[in-house]
């Protein structure tokens, strides 16, 4: 940074002057000078607190609350006495009148005081902004930001680099802590910074860095530029956007944008159905891009496709341009896409952000990350009882012992290992990791200890679960198995005898159904137990197991022999190296190809998948669905057949995938319809944990509310809507550390079992549960979490339920929030919107409006706001509700004493206690149904105006008019509460495009969706065109002999009358072969047209403005004629080509030159197959005079079209405007200087994805076995 020094005497003078000036005014900053001052306007702050100031409430004639005029539109008022703690409403009245409704015009502002306080109010007349000191703290005058740099002298704002003389003082006229200053900047290059105050003590430069480098500013032409400084982030920027023209081999990365969460850039939001159209858009600096393309990978078809995008227009302020493509897909799949952007020699790529969470993407020089788009079966759905359910997961052995007679039904665990039975229900699970430590009493054997919990115990506690609000129970495995976890199935056809009998199972199912509870079973179909009737490693079963028969020398004798791969040395494939879990063989890539296994699990009449849903031909006695273990380690087609099978018993029965990551491919509609949402768990933990922590499943690092929202929105965006509302949103499971222990409390650990640790952990659990119960999906409670059970990693995460020793206060909390969920349909199937995500507070909104939920089902109107505050202090947040709900909607906080809240002025202010949350539910009976969306909207373009009309909407008392420059978004409301069904927009510029949409509003303020877009192009009527130049006949054809300039004129009253080119006028010269001349025979044999090319229509070239001819504007163009005799005309449009006015058509003869010899034909080589490109090469042609250029033509089955021209020294061309899987034909035409032309041969090619050979070289230790497995995802790889 460069700084000039001045004498202390001078600085002292400046400081004294500033002190004198500022002493006369309040603490608010000065504003930029505006064209007109508003000192004559009287502004009153009025509200329901005026009585405390010796006035009457809402008194617009008050002389007590008149605001002091500070200058440049700014008013200020500070209460002379403290206002009492409480909630108040207020607004600003102008000139002692309610004309215009006051400020703001719609609704009142809210003031919440937790203590008696003086309050200062501010009003900016120029921006119509109002705020108060509870929401806003201004920078003091002596620290006001100001511009300093070489720009000062250019704008008359003091001496360069002298903050003491800078008069470029920035102000905050919207009260949002963003300070601005506007000045007229001459053309030139500048450097500047921002200082706070009139010294260098605190200054900010590039990227908002304190004492950072100077900021560069290059101004191409004189311009009014606004400079901005954000007092919170210290970022500095301008609104300057120089106009780009032509190719500059540069792309402005900062202006590129694609945001998958913004419906303007991706519409509709989230996963789409097969056949549904998704619109994708990308933003760039206006006139920056030469072309934009999308490249996407189809995860199912394993194909990559590149397609061109279309430039659809520019932003209303002219700063940005937008490119668009519409896509639809005819099959379920997952799409990965990014954008390829070109400007001359520069190529940029725009893909997802580094975390690949969707939302706002990132520009890079090379391909980086792809955005994700899920396409699912249009008939995909889930049972309504899944959506918004409260689920309860039970580990049967540890829940409740209802039948002690089966406690010792078995004596052996795996092989000959004994069963270790706990006679004390309150023992901790045996953890062999602790063997050898003081106090350890276990036998050191894994998974062989039992407590006696059983199916009857669950049945006995159904009333408890019903009282907890549970509507779905998920049972860990219950089939015969040697272990306590039972993920090592010994016999799929039997209930484990320590859990009960088939009759106990049927009774549990029937009793649960009678109480409105559905039950999900756990299916383990990737592996079995080695101690099973199927493998029978230890010979405990009379049936011939696969391993048993292998030992006898013939594995095929066993009916289960083909289920497993057993090597000659007795080793076998097992799950993650555990020899207790032999894996089912994947034959030719799928377990389903093992016929006997597929029949046993899926195909047979009483196959396992179907039997347990209907064990006795009474559906009420069967389970309701399956949770399926390690599903991503089983071939997908196995699961599609599994789905088909269970649909024959209970259609759309749950298939819940155990998938710890992105389960999009599992949720396309052909198999799974839900997933264990471990991502939800991890996101909630990261938000609440407060410190880095490894819970045994992965590292947790703290995030703020904005990152939490980004992560949760990523899940919402990827999953089909029915699946998203049916995801199993868990906080813990049998595979994770207890959620209380994750949050710092473990009753069995002296270092973590203090009352303070428990209190803090329970507070965090309550926060997590509030959000879980307010969020779409199945809110899953892991047994005992609600009773205060803690526990470390497996096996400590499977402690017994503390019957008789529950944390009853925590149980009551769970009962309360689950009842709030169950009693309010809006929390089950209402739509979802993020309302607030800043720092420590996260808030979501749920709605059932217009009488419909997120799935179009009919329910009474309702709304909810759910928010959590993780900070140690109370938080007051103000939520913008303008796009969520109308004013006047009232809520009660059902967690905190039914405290009332109401939306006013397009916002709602909510008080959230420290380390707590709120669940606001709208009061019953409120009308949230909007009028019908306006239809038959018509925009009629006129001269300087657009006339709109539409049909009356039932229930509407008014209409809002929205306008944009592009279809589908960027709308600005230009009129409110229009009472009729017509509107005239006169605030338009002729020649520009305007897009309109209209919404209907009822008397309460419910606003409908916007109507379908309608487009208008206001324009001056073109009154006359003519004076087209007549080209002289017998024009000799030659590359060096273009026609003379061809002129024409246009007159449009009001547009061309004034000096200079009429704005937005387009002129084009058109030409085509007209035939019927004496030279046709010559042209047919020498200057022949390219075969297969349609040249029957006009070809158009742009004409240039020349000057004024009286009241007319004159334009010109010229032609290089390449064949035959020509007809030509000129056309004009001042409405962006929507309509044209043409001159008369003239013609002239083109005659051949002395050179009638055609070039030799180029030989076009057959190109190789490549993905999304075709690379052409050819042999050079020869000619008696020389080759002028080569023209490249392409056909995709119809006529040939010229796609490029290259010089005479270029013999190759790469066509990237192709689509994989489409067949193209190409030919090259050689032309000489007299346009004698000769075609090459035709080649045909179909671009496609090309497999490549990859060799992996791995260095391993000497003791490594001969075979090494390579883990990963390699679609369609051939080894």
UniProtKB/Swiss-Prot annotation:
Root EC class: hydrolase
Signal found in the keyword field: yes
Name of the protein in its database record: Amylopullulanase
Pfam families in the record: Alpha-amylase, Alpha-amylase_N, X25_BaPul_like
CDD domains referenced in this protein's UniProt entry, alphabetically: AmyAc_CMD, E_set_CDase_PDE_N, FN3, X25_BaPul_like
Residues annotated for substrate binding in this entry: 527, 627, 734-735, 794, 798
Binding site for Ca(2+) 1: 248, 250, 288, 343
EC numbers, comma separated: 3.2.1.1, 3.2.1.41
Gene name linked to the record: apu
Active site (record annotation): 629, 658
Cofactor(s) listed: Ca(2+)
């Amino acid at each position: 940074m460069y700084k000039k020094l001045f004498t202390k005497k001078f600085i002292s003078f400046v400081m004294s002057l500033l002190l004198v000036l500022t002493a006369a005014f309040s603490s608010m900053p000065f504003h930029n000078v505006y064209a007109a001052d508003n000192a004559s306007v009287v502004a009153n702050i009025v509200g329901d607190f005026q009585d405390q100031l010796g006035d009457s409430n809402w008194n617009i004639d008050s002389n007590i609350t008149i605001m002091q005029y500070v200058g440049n539109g700014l008013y200020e008022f500070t209460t002379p006495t403290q206002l009492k703690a409480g909630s108040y409403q207020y607004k600003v009245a102008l000139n002692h009148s309610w004309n215009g409704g006051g400020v703001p015009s719609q609704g009142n502002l809210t003031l919440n005081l937790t203590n008696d306080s003086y309050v200062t109010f501010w009003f900016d007349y120029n921006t119509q902004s109002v705020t108060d000191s509870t929401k806003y703290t201004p920078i003091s005058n002596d620290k006001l930001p100001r511009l300093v740099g070489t720009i000062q002298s250019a704008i008359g704002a003091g001496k360069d680099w002298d903050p003491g003389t800078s008069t470029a003082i920035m102000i905050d006229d919207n009260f949002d802590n963003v300070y601005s200053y506007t000045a007229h900047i001459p053309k030139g290059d500048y450097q500047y910074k921002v200082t706070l105050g009139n010294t260098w003590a605190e200054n900010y430069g590039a990227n908002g860095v304190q004492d950072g480098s100077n900021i560069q500013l290059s101004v191409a032409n004189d311009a009014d530029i606004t400079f901005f400084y954000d007092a919170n982030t210290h970022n500095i920027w301008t609104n300057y956007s120089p106009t780009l023209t032509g190719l500059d081999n540069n792309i402005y990365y900062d202006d590129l944008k694609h945001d998958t969460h913004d419906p303007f850039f991706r519409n509709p939001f989230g996963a789409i159905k097969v056949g549904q159209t998704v619109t994708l858009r990308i933003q760039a600096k206006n006139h920056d891009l030469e072309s934009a393309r999308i490249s996407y990978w189809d995860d199912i078809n394993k194909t990559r496709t590149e397609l061109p995008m279309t430039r659809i227009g520019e932003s209303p302020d002219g700063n940005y341009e937008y490119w668009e493509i519409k896509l639809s897909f005819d099959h379920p799949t997952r799409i990965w896409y990014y954008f390829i952007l070109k400007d001359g020699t520069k190529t940029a790529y725009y893909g997802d952000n580094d975390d690949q969470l969707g939302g706002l993407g990132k520009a890079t020089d090379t391909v980086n990350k792809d955005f994700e788009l899920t396409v699912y079966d249009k008939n995909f759905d889930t049972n309504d009882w899944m959506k918004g359910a409260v689920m309860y997961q039970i580990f049967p052995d540890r829940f409740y012992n209802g039948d002690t007679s089966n406690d010792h039904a078995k004596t052996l665990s795996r092989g000959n290992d004994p069963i270790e039975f706990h006679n004390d229900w309150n023992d901790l699970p045996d953890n062999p990791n602790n063997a050898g430590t003081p106090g350890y009493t276990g036998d050191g054997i894994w998974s062989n200890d039992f407590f006696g919990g059983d199916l009857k115990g669950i049945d006995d506690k159904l009333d408890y679960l019903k009282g907890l609000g549970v509507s779905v129970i998920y049972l860990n495995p219950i089939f015969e198995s040697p272990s306590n976890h039972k993920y090592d199935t010994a016999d799929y056809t039997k209930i484990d005898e320590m859990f009960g009998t088939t009759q106990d199972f049927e009774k549990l199912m029937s009793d649960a159904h009678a109480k409105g509870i559905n039950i999900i079973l756990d299916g383990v179909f990737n592996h079995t137990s080695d101690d099973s009737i199927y493998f029978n490693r230890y010979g405990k079963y009379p049936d011939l197991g696969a391993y048993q028969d292998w030992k006898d020398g013939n594995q095929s004798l066993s009916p289960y022999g083909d289920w497993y791969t057993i090597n000659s040395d007795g080793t076998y494939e097992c799950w993650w190296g555990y020899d207790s879990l032999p894996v089912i063989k994947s034959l030719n890539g799928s377990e389903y190809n093992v016929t006997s296994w597929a029949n046993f699990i899926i195909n047979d009449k009483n196959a396992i998948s179907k039997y347990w849903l209907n064990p006795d031909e009474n559906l009420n006695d069967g389970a309701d669905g399956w949770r399926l273990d390690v599903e991503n380690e089983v071939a997908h087609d196995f699961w599609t057949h599994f789905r088909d099978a269970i649909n024959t018993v209970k259609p759309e029965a749950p298939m819940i995938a155990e998938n710890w990551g992105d389960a999009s491919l599992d949720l396309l509609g052909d198999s799974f319809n839900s997933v264990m949402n471990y991502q939800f768990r991890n996101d909630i933990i990261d938000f609440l944990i407060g410190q880095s922590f490894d819970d045994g499943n992965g590292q947790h690092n703290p995030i703020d509310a904005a990152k939490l929202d980004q992560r949760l929105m990523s899940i919402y965006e990827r999953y089909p809507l029915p699946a998203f509302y049916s995801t199993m949103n868990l906080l813990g499971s049998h595979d994770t550390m207890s959620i209380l222990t994750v949050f710092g409390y473990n009753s069995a650990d002296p270092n973590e079992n203090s009352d303070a640790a428990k209190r803090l952990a329970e507070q965090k659990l309550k926060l997590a549960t509030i959000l879980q119960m307010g969020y779409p999906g199945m809110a899953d409670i892991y047994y005992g979490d609600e009773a205060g059970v803690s526990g470390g990693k497996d096996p400590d995460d499977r402690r017994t339920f503390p019957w008789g020793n529950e944390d009853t206060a925590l149980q009551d909390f769970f009962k309360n929030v689950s009842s709030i969920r169950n009693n309010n349909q809006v929390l089950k199937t209402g739509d979802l919107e993020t309302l607030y995500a800043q720092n420590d507070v996260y808030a979501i909104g749920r709605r059932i409006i217009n009488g419909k939920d997120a799935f179009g089902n009919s329910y009474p109107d309702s709304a909810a706001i759910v928010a959590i505050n993780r900070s140690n202090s109370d938080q007051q947040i103000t939520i913008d509700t303008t796009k969520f709900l109308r004013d006047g909607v009232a809520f009660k906080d059902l967690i905190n004493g039914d405290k009332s809240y109401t939306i006013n002025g397009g916002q709602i202010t909510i008080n959230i206690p420290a380390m707590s949350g709120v669940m606001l539910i709208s009061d019953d009976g409120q009308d949230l149904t909007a009028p019908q969306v306006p239809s038959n909207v018509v925009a009629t373009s006129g001269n300087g105006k657009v006339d709109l009309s539409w049909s009356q909407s039932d229930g509407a008392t008014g209409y809002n008019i929205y306008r944009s420059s592009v279809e589908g978004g960027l709308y600005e409301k230009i009129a409110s509460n229009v009472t009729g069904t017509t509107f005239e927009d006169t605030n338009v510029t002729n020649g520009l495009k305007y897009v309109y949409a209209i919404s209907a509003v009822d008397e309460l303020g419910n606003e409908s969706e916007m109507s379908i877009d309608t487009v208008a192009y206001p324009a001056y009527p073109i009154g006359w065109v003519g004076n087209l130049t007549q080209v002289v006949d017998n024009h000799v054809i030659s590359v060096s002999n273009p026609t003379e300039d061809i002129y024409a004129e246009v007159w449009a009253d009001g547009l061309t009358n004034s000096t200079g080119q009429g704005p937005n006028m387009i002129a084009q010269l058109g030409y085509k072969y007209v035939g019927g001349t004496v030279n046709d025979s010559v042209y047919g044999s020498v200057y022949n047209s390219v075969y297969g090319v349609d040249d029957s229509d006009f070809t158009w070239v742009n004409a240039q403005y020349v000057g004024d001819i009286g009241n007319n504007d004159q334009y010109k163009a010229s032609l290089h004629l390449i064949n035959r005799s020509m007809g030509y005309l000129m056309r004009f449009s001042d409405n962006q080509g929507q309509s044209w006015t043409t001159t008369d058509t003239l013609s002239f003869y083109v005659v051949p030159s002395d050179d009638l010899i055609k070039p030799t034909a180029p030989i076009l080589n057959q190109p190789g197959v490549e993905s999304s490109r075709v690379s052409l090469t050819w042999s050079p042609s020869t000619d008696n005079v020389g080759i002028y250029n080569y023209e490249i033509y392409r056909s995709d089955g119809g006529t040939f079209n010229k796609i490029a021209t290259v010089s005479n020294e270029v013999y190759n061309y790469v066509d990237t405007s192709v689509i994989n899987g489409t067949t193209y034909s190409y030919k090259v035409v050689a032309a000489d200087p007299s346009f004698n032309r000769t075609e090459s041969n035709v080649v045909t090619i179909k671009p496609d994805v090309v497999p490549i050979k990859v060799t992996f070289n791995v260095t391993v230790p000497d003791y490594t076995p001969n075979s090494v497995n390579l883990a990963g995802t390699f679609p369609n790889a051939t080894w």
